[in-house]
Amino acid sequence: MEDRIEKIVQTLDNNKADEIEVFDLREKNYFVDYAIIASSLGSKHTFALLDHLRDDLKPQEKFINVEESGDWIVVDLGDILIHIMTPEYRTKYDMETFLSSLANGREGDTI
């Protein structure tokens, strides 16, 4: 699992994603083991990062579902969820606060 996370982070980093964060949710009441959030430089870069992930992770990874928009892409690998967001969407939706509360065992806290 750690190798998979490292490969995802490396792919995002090598392709100029910003503020990459990994949340370990294995012991929490969440539907995936890990969540990864990364910022893109803009809409075109968001799609480019998705293309790089597809190129670098296939055929090892099965992309169960991909929700695409220029501002926010969610990649579901089954046990890992990857969020690629423009800085504006990342600020607006503040997924870090939600995922940090889960990772720190505060599942019931309101955000």
Where does each model-flagged region fall?
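Short Gly/Ser/Thr- and Asp/Glu-enriched loop/turn motifs at secondary-structure junctions
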Residues: 29-31, 68-70, 77
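Short, conserved loop-to-beta-strand elements that form functional interface hotspots
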Residues: 61-72
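C-terminal structural segments of small proteins and small subunits
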Residues: 74-102
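Ribosome large-subunit tunnel/peptidyl-transferase-proximal elements
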Residues: 1-38, 42-57, 61-62, 104-111
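Conserved hydrophobic/aromatic beta-strand scaffold that supports enzyme active sites
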Residues: 37, 72-74
